[in-house]
């Protein structure tokens, strides 16, 4: 029995199961927790299928999503695993980023091969920037014909290649059900799958290693000291006496120096990703900076007004619009901390977008917003969320 010791220093990786309905995503998730629990009992608890399947509701950017989070460890890594039971839940999660993925396990039933949702999930994974996909060919115990299973594997590889994923990614034949029942051969298959996950999904770049960015939530003046901007550091690290740049909302950018970093009324040497801090800025007046701008490492982020996005539009039942929208729709786009009005252009051949649809759109904002590809936003009408999306391409 291999002993793995608990280390907080293990790399932490977020993964998820994706694929067509009834191909066994949730069963596989349960099988992984059971197999790893049996292999490293002191590191893992086992989660039954129905515990995962009854996914709790979460609200993310005003959208309700059913999603299950389980965690487990291999010898090498600590994993947080998300499983969205319904197809609509999966799409909403991918677009709103309720649960970010560093990699995904694409579950394909060997008995069926790739199905419409398989393709849709892989396409979405590409659009929302999931870095890596590997494959679990599930229900492999139910296919005796080696040629048939090889054919399915080829189809899956073609599907990955078509979306620029690694077509040589591991494809592991598993039977989640048999593994849950304790069948030795198939337990081993799930262990092999997790070895492949350990080896092939790259270590994520930690937020603290990326260039500094903090969205401005509030601005106030401290008499005798100057102007303070507050917010939660989104990524990177900022040190006292470092130069920063204020970007977005207004034309041009402003450079300044951080003369102090405060958290909970204590002075710090630095603020890092995840911290809620106040930054004291040299030579900046209260009216020079406003909510909705971002403070960044100079030259790392630029303001833009024109972009393409992939969006999910809430259905009427979810509190969204009751009617479709058409070309030149003008809602507000909520980026990080503020709303900016924009004009929507629909893709060629799309007349209208119905509540409950997901679609690509092009947007022209009336004010520039600091953005990178992958940035998420909500679509709002008078403060009410009617959709969510992410930037897929920046034009200007």
Swiss-Prot record:
GO terms for cellular component: cytosol. One of its GO terms (molecular function) is GTP binding. Gene3D superfamilies: P-loop containing nucleotide triphosphate hydrolases, Translation factors. Pfam families: GTP_EFTU, GTP_EFTU_D2, GTP_EFTU_D3. It catalyses: GTP + H2O = GDP + phosphate + H(+). GTP binds at residues 19-26, 83-87, 138-141. Residues 175-177 are annotated as: G5. It comes from the Bacteria. Its EC number is 3.6.5.3. Residues 138-141 are annotated as: G4. It is an enzyme of class 3 (hydrolase). Its main location: cytoplasm. Residues 19-26 are annotated as: G1. Residues 62-66 are annotated as: G2. Residues 83-86 are annotated as: G3. Residues 10-205 form the tr-type G domain. It is found in: Cytoplasm. Mg(2+) binds at residue 26. Keywords: Cytoplasm, Elongation factor, GTP-binding, Hydrolase, Magnesium, Metal-binding, Nucleotide-binding, Protein biosynthesis. GTP hydrolase that promotes the GTP-dependent binding of aminoacyl-tRNA to the A-site of ribosomes during protein biosynthesis. Monomer. Belongs to the TRAFAC class translation factor GTPase superfamily. Classic translation factor GTPase family. EF-Tu/EF-1A subfamily. This is Elongation factor Tu. It comes from Mycobacterium sp. (strain KMS). The gene is tuf.
């Amino acid at each position: 029995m291999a002993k793995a010791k608990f280390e907080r220093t293990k790399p932490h990786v977020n993964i998820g199961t994706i694929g067509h309905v009834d191909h066994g995503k949730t069963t596989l998730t349960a099988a992984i927790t059971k197999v790893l629990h049996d292999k490293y009992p002191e590191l893992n608890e086992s989660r039954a299928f129905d515990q995962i399947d009854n996914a709790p509701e979460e609200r993310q950017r005003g959208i309700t999503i059913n999603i299950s989070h389980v965690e487990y460890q291999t010898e090498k890594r600590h994993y947080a695993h998300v499983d969205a039971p319904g197809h609509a839940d999966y799409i909403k999660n991918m677009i709103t980023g309720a649960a970010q993925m560093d990699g995904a396990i694409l579950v394909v039933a060997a008995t069926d091969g790739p199905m419409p949702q398989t393709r849709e999930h892989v396409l979405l994974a590409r659009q929302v920037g999931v870095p890596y996909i590997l494959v679990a060919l599930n229900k492999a115990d139910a296919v005796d014909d080696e040629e048939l299973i090889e054919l399915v594997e080829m189809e899956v590889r073609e599907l990955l290649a078509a979306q620029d994923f690694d077509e040589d990614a591991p494809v592991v034949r598993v039977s989640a059900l048999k593994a849950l029942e304790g069948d030795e051969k198939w337990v081993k298959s799930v262990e092999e799958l997790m070895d492949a996950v350990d080896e092939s999904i790259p270590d994520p770049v930690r937020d603290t290693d990326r260039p500094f960015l903090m969205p401005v939530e509030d601005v106030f003046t401290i008499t005798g000291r100057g102007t303070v901007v507050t917010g939660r550091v989104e990524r990177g690290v900022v040190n006292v006496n470092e130069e920063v740049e204020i970007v977005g909302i207004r034309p041009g950018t402003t450079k300044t120096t951080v003369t102090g970093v405060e958290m909970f009324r204590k002075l710090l040497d630095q603020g890092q990703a995840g911290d809620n801090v106040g930054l004291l800025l040299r030579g900046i007046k209260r009216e020079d900076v406003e909510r909705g701008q971002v403070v960044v490492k100079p030259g790392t982020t630029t303001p833009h007004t024109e972009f393409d996005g992939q969006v999910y539009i809430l259905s009427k039942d979810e509190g969204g619009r009751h009617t479709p929208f058409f070309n030149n729709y003008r809602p507000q786009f909520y980026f990080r901390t503020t709303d900016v009005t924009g004009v929507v252009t629909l893709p060629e051949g799309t007349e209208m977008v119905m509540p409950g649809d997901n679609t690509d759109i092009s947007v022209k904002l009336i004010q520039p917003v600091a953005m990178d590809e992958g940035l998420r936003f909500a679509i709002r009408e008078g403060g009410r969320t009617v959709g969510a999306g992410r930037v897929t391409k920046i034009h200007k």
